[in-house]
A protein has these predicted regions:
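A short, proline-enriched helix->beta-strand linker immediately N-terminal to the Walker B motif
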Residues: 170-174
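Short catalytic/signature loops enriched in Gly
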Residues: 3, 142-145, 236-319
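Conserved ABC ATPase "signature" region
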Residues: 75, 126-146, 255
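A short, flexible loop at the N-terminus of ABC-type nucleotide-binding domains that lies
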Residues: 1-4, 13-26, 57-63, 80-83, ...
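P-loop NTP-binding/switch modules centered on Walker-like glycine-rich loops
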Residues: 56, 177, 181, 185-264
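Conserved ABC transporter NBD signature motif
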Residues: 64-75
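Conserved ABC ATPase signature
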Residues: 150-155, 159
Length: 319
C-alpha cells in the first residue's frame, strides 16, 4: 500500500493547573489513497485527539509532545501556520460530531460556504454561489436554494450534517476526517449519511478516516480499522481480520460486548477510570490474560499477517 498519510508514534498531552495529562501516548497508523479507514475505541481512548492533531486543531492547553504526521511524505508538524492553511480545509478536510456547534449561528449556510470556497480557490462571488448550489445538490439536499439561505438552527440535524459534508467537499480534499458524524442522528438518517460518505468516497477516490465508538458502523463502511485504547493503537488490520480474528484482548472484549440480535451480549466491558501507567499496556488493569511480563514493560507490535498488527505480549496464546 502506497501511504498517503502516516502517523508515527504520536504523543499528545493536555496541561491544566493539576499538571500534565497524556491523552495520546504513542499512536500510529497509515492510510492509502482511496482508503476508508476506521478508528474505533471507547470515549477517552484518544481517537478524536489523534485525528484533530493531524490538522493541529487542539485547544491552547493541548501540545503535541512527539511523533510524526507524514502527508505525502512531508511532516505536517514541521509546517508553519501559513503552510498548514493550504492543507487544513484544503487537501485534508474534517467534519465534526456536533454540526450545530461547528456552524456559525450568525451566518447563513450560503454565506459561510461562499467564504470558505473563495478562501481556497480563485472563484468570484457569483462562481462560488453556483458551486455552493452544486455541492448542496451533490449531498442530497432537495432544495439547495432554500438551504443556502437558511441559518444553521433552521435546519434539521441530518440537513446540517449534509451541509458540513458539502463544506468539507468544497475543496476536493484528498482526505476527509469524519469525527463521529452520525452519533447525534437517528438510525434512518445515520444510514443515509453513511451511504452518502461511501458514495462520495468512491466517486472522488478520496480517503476517509472515520472516528467512531460503534463497531456496527465500522463493519458497514470501512476497509481497514485501528482499535485505540488508553492513547495507543492496540490493533490494526482489515475489517475482516479485526472482526473474525481479533488478536488483542481489548479488541476481543469490545466485540464480545456488542449486543446480538435475539440475544444478549457475551460480556460487559468494564471501564477503567485510572490514568494507568504510560509505560505499560493500557488494557493491563482489565485484561484477564495479564501476567508479570505485562507488568514489566510496554509490549511491542506483532504482525499476525501482512498489515495486521497487534500490540500485546501474549498474542499467540489468545488467537
Amino acid at each position: 500500500m502506497e501511504k498517503l498519510l502516516e502517523v508515527k508514534d504520536l504523543k499528545v498531552s493536555f496541561f491544566t493547573d493539576l499538571g500534565e495529562t497524556q491523552a495520546v501516548k504513542g499512536a500510529g497508523f497509515a492510510i492509502g489513497e482511496g482508503d476508508f479507514f476506521g478508528i474505533v475505541g471507547e470515549s477517552g481512548s484518544g481517537k478524536s485527539v489523534t485525528t484533530k492533531s493531524i490538522l493541529r486543531l487542539g485547544p491552547s492547553n493541548c501540545k503535541i509532545m512527539g511523533g510524526e504526521i507524514l502527508f505525502r511524505g512531508e511532516d505536517i508538524l514541521k509546517k508553519n501556520e501559513a503552510e498548514l492553511r493550504g492543507i487544513r480545509g484544503g487537501e485534508i478536510a474534517m467534519i465534526f460530531q456536533d454540526s450545530l456547534s461547528a456552524l456559525n449561528p450568525v451566518y447563513t449556510v450560503g454565506n459561510k460556504m461562499v467564504e470558505l470556497i473563495r478562501r481556497h480557490t480563485n472563484m468570484n462571488k457569483k462562481e462560488a454561489k453556483a458551486r455552493v448550489l452544486e455541492l448542496l445538490t451533490a449531498v442530497g439536499i432537495t432544495d439547495p436554494e432554500k438551504a443556502m439561505n437558511s441559518y444553521p438552527h433552521e435546519l434539521s440535524g441530518g440537513m446540517r450534517q449534509r451541509v458540513m459534508i458539502a463544506m468539507a467537499m468544497s475543496s476536493d480534499p484528498k482526505i476527509l476526517i469524519a469525527d463521529e458524524p452520525t452519533t447525534a442522528l437517528d438510525v434512518t438518517i445515520q444510514a443515509q449519511i453513511l451511504h452518502l460518505l461511501l458514495e462520495l468516497q468512491k466517486k472522488n477516490n478520496m480517503s476517509i478516516i472515520l472516528i467512531t465508538h460503534d463497531l456496527g458502523v465500522v463493519a458497514q463502511t470501512c476497509k481497514r480499522v485501528a482499535v485505540m485504547c488508553g492513547g495507543y493503537v492496540v490493533e490494526e488490520g482489515t475489517v475482516e481480520e479485526i472482526f473474525l480474528h481479533p488478536g488483542h484482548p481489548y479488541t476481543q472484549a469490545l466485540i464480545a460486548s456488542m449486543p446480538r440480535v435475539g440475544g444478549t451480549f457475551e460480556q460487559f466491558l468494564e471501564r477503567d477510570f485510572s490514568d494507568g501507567n504510560g509505560n505499560l499496556c493500557p488494557f493491563l488493569n482489565r485484561c484477564k490474560y495479564a501476567d508479570k511480563t505485562c507488568e514489566a514493560c510496554l509490549p511491542k507490535y506483532y504482525e499476525a499477517s501482512e498489515g495486521h498488527r497487534i500490540f500485546c505480549h501474549r498474542r499467540e496464546e489468545k488467537r
